Protein backbone atom coordinates (compact mmCIF):
# COMPACT_ATOMS: atom_id res chain seq x y z
CA UNK A 1 0.00 0.00 0.00
CA UNK A 2 1.25 3.46 -0.86
CA UNK A 3 1.95 6.07 1.79
CA UNK A 4 -0.67 8.76 2.39
CA UNK A 5 1.77 11.46 1.23
CA UNK A 6 2.38 9.63 -2.06
CA UNK A 7 -1.34 9.25 -2.71
CA UNK A 8 -1.89 12.97 -2.14
CA UNK A 9 1.00 13.72 -4.50
CA UNK A 10 -0.48 11.53 -7.27
CA UNK A 11 -3.90 13.13 -6.94
CA UNK A 12 -2.63 16.69 -7.35
CA UNK A 13 -3.22 18.03 -10.87
CA UNK A 14 -0.04 18.04 -12.93
CA UNK A 15 1.33 21.24 -14.42
CA UNK A 16 1.51 19.63 -17.86
CA UNK A 17 -0.93 17.04 -19.25
CA UNK A 18 1.96 14.92 -20.56
CA UNK A 19 3.16 14.20 -17.02
CA UNK A 20 -0.04 12.35 -16.06
CA UNK A 21 0.11 8.57 -16.03
CA UNK A 22 -2.06 5.68 -14.92
CA UNK A 23 -1.81 4.15 -11.45
CA UNK A 24 -3.73 1.40 -9.72
CA UNK A 25 -6.64 2.78 -7.65
CA UNK A 26 -5.95 0.34 -4.80
CA UNK A 27 -2.18 0.08 -4.39
CA UNK A 28 -0.83 2.90 -6.59
CA UNK A 29 1.31 0.61 -8.75
CA UNK A 30 2.25 2.26 -12.08
CA UNK A 31 3.16 -0.93 -13.97
CA UNK A 32 0.87 -3.69 -15.20
CA UNK A 33 -2.10 -1.28 -15.34
CA UNK A 34 -5.38 -2.56 -16.84
CA UNK A 35 -7.10 0.55 -18.17
CA UNK A 36 -10.62 -0.93 -18.40
CA UNK A 37 -10.71 -1.62 -14.65
CA UNK A 38 -8.29 1.03 -13.36
CA UNK A 39 -6.30 -1.63 -11.50
CA UNK A 40 -2.85 -3.19 -11.70
CA UNK A 41 -2.63 -6.86 -12.69
CA UNK A 42 -2.02 -8.00 -9.12
CA UNK A 43 -5.04 -6.25 -7.60
CA UNK A 44 -7.15 -7.29 -10.59
CA UNK A 45 -6.21 -10.93 -10.06
CA UNK A 46 -6.97 -10.81 -6.33
CA UNK A 47 -10.38 -9.20 -6.83
CA UNK A 48 -11.26 -11.49 -9.75
CA UNK A 49 -10.47 -14.63 -7.72
CA UNK A 50 -12.62 -13.33 -4.84
CA UNK A 51 -15.46 -12.66 -7.32
CA UNK A 52 -15.58 -8.94 -6.54
CA UNK A 53 -15.35 -7.80 -10.18
CA UNK A 54 -18.69 -8.44 -11.92
CA UNK A 55 -18.47 -10.38 -15.18
CA UNK A 56 -14.90 -11.60 -14.64
CA UNK A 57 -13.94 -15.16 -13.88
CA UNK A 58 -10.91 -17.37 -14.34
CA UNK A 59 -10.63 -18.87 -17.81
CA UNK A 60 -10.97 -22.62 -18.21
CA UNK A 61 -10.72 -24.57 -21.47
From Swiss-Prot:
Cofactor: Zn(2+)
Gene3D superfamilies hit by this protein: 30s Ribosomal Protein S14, Chain N
GO biological process: translation
Name recorded for this polypeptide: Small ribosomal subunit protein uS14
Keywords: Metal-binding, Ribonucleoprotein, Ribosomal protein, RNA-binding, rRNA-binding, Zinc
Pfam families, per the entry: Ribosomal_S14
Quaternary structure (record): Part of the 30S ribosomal subunit. Contacts proteins S3 and S10.
Role: Binds 16S rRNA, required for the assembly of 30S particles and may also be responsible for determining the conformation of the 16S rRNA at the A site.
Family from the record: Belongs to the universal ribosomal protein uS14 family. Zinc-binding uS14 subfamily.
Cofactor binding description: Binds 1 zinc ion per subunit.
InterPro entries: Ribosomal_uS14, Ribosomal_uS14_bact, Ribosomal_uS14_CS, Ribosomal_uS14_sf
Gene transcribed to yield this protein: rpsZ
Molecular-function GO term, any one: rRNA binding
Binding site for Zn(2+): 24, 27, 40, 43
